[in-house]
Each structure stands twice: as structure tokens, then as C-alpha cells.
């Protein structure tokens, strides 16, 4: 599992850096909630929590479910977000473990959560979540375990939200937000300084299934900007061994992070 804190715009602020693919893609999950809830007629409310594992909206593979909780401090606009992503033992699909190598569509992989409300006014929606887990041709094999894990993730988010509320009460929400932004700018500066020392390059990697990954790195030292271009890579494979954009982005960001000697935080910067 991975836990993280985000600012009001869904940008990563702090995390426990144990699972890079989780943390580099979780921000897109939070921003999906912000984007979709802004136009759904209900909006984001106090006491809410949402579940998401949709690969094209910030998820990785379906067993990794992200629970996202808004943190309200002063008004009806979330000041921050907290999230907990946990790998579930099984989420349905055509094979136990929900990672079938021969799946051809998302339903065969398992149960999809795409911005589902699972906590309303502080109450976990047991019946709705259980109905969702047991729906479809290949439902979850142990929904009670999934619900227990989701409740643990909700509890982790509640603890983080409470700590952020206490911090904001002690120092002021604007001060807390300002220091979050400062940490992001510090990380950005460190990465831009690294980029200025890198060289252009082109690489190809052959996979054991016959596919190839092509990577071209273009450095602009003046702007301290890097472009990573995957043009020339093999087309989408007809199975589940593909990487959606948030996962690709997470991999690229972590490579840059590992090249830094400075003890900077892993955040949106």
C-alpha cells in the first residue's frame, strides 16, 4: 500500500516513497476526482471518500484501488486531499488474483472502480460497495475481504485528514499550503538543475514477447527542460501487458528522481 498527501489541485506533496509506480500516478487519480466531480451535479462534499482503480484515470492494474478523501478546512472547497492506494488480493476477473495474462478487455481483468463514492457523510456505503464488487460476469471472489481492506484505507485517509486539519489549525491553512508549494518548487529546481547536466540519447529495448520500447531523450539546457519521446515503440498489445499514460509518467519521473543526489521529497515538482 501507499499513502500520500496532495494540495487542493491534486498535486503530490508528500508520501512514503516505497512504491514508485503508485506515487507517480496517484496524482492523476485525485485530479480525475476533481475533474469529474466538478461537473456531476453533486460535487465534492465533507465526509466523502471515493474509490478509483481505472487505468486511464490514474490507476495501475485493477487490484490497486485508490481511496481518495478531500480535506476541508475553512470553506466548502477542499484545501487538500489525502489518498491511500492498496493492492487487493483479488478483484474478480477470469483468474484469481485479477492479473490474467490473457485478458482481452477490462471486464476480464476484474471489477472497475472509476470515481465511485464509497463514503457519504462519514458513513461507509457497505451495500453499494458490495453490490459493485459482486456485479458482472466475473465478480470479486471475496468481497468481504475487499470491503475490510477498503475500510482500512478509509481509516488511513481519516488519520491523514485529521493531522492536516490539526496542522492547519495550528499554523493557518494558507501557511501550510505555502510550505507545500515551496517543497514542490524545491523539487522542481533540483530536477531542472539535473536536466541541465544530461545529454540527448536514443535507446531501444526488446521485450521477450517480441515487442520493442523506443525512447528518445531530448534535452534543452537553456530552458532546463527534457522531452521523453516513445515514438517508434510497438503498438498496444492485445492483452493486459500495456502501460497507460499515468504509469509511463510515473516511471519517467522515478528515473529522474533516482539520478538526484539531493535528499528532496518525491512530489509533483
Q: Whereabouts are the PLM-identified features?
A:
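Conserved mixed alpha/beta core segments that line enzyme active sites in large multi-domain catalysts
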Residues: 11-13, 27-70, 204-206
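A short, polar/charged loop-to-alpha-helix boundary motif
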Residues: 20-33, 89-98
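Gly/Pro-rich active-site capping loops and adjacent beta-alpha segments
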Residues: 77-139, 236-239, 250
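A short, hydrophobic, proline-anchored segment that marks a local hinge/packing element in signaling
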Residues: 65-74, 83, 218-219
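N-terminal leader/propeptide and maturation segments of large enzyme subunits in energy/redox metabolism
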Residues: 112-190
Amino acid at each position: 500500500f501507499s499513502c500520500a498527501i496532495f494540495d487542493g489541485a491534486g498535486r503530490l506533496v508528500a508520501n512514503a516513497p516505497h512504491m514508485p509506480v503508485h506515487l507517480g500516478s496517484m496524482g492523476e487519480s485525485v485530479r480525475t476526482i476533481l475533474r469529474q466531480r466538478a461537473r456531476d451535479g453533486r460535487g465534492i462534499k465533507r465526509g466523502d471518500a471515493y474509490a478509483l482503480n481505472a487505468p486511464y484515470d490514474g490507476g495501475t492494474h485493477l487490484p490497486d484501488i485508490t481511496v481518495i478523501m478531500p480535506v476541508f478546512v475553512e470553506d466548502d472547497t477542499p484545501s487538500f486531499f489525502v489518498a491511500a492506494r492498496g493492492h487487493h488480493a483479488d478483484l474478480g476477473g477470469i483468474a484469481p488474483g485479477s492479473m490474467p495474462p490473457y485478458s482481452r478487455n477490462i471486464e476480464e481483468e476484474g471489477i472497475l472502480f472509476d470515481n465511485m463514492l464509497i463514503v457519504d457523510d462519514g458513513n461507509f456505503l457497505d451495500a453499494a460497495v458490495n453490490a459493485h464488487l459482486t456485479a458482472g460476469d466475473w465478480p470479486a471472489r471475496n468481497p468481504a475481504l475487499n470491503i475490510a481492506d477498503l475500510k482500512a484505507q478509509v481509516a488511513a485517509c481519516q488519520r491523514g485528514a485529521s493531522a492536516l486539519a490539526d496542522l492547519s489549525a495550528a499554523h493557518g491553512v494558507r501557511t501550510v499550503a505555502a510550505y507545500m508549494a515551496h517543497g514542490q518548487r524545491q523539487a522542481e529546481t533540483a530536477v531542472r538543475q539535473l536536466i541541465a547536466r544530461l545529454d540527448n540519447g536514443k535507446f531501444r529495448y526488446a521485450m521477450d514477447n517480441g515487442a520493442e520500447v523506443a525512447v528518445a531523450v531530448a534535452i534543452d539546457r537553456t530552458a532546463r527542460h527534457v522531452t521523453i519521446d516513445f515514438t517508434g515503440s510497438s503498438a498496444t498489445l492485445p492483452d493486459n501487458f500495456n502501460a497507460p499514460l499515468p504509469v509511463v509518467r510515473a516511471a519517467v519521473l522515478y528515473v529522474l528522481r533516482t539520478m538526484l543526489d539531493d535528499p528532496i521529497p518525491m512530489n509533483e515538482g
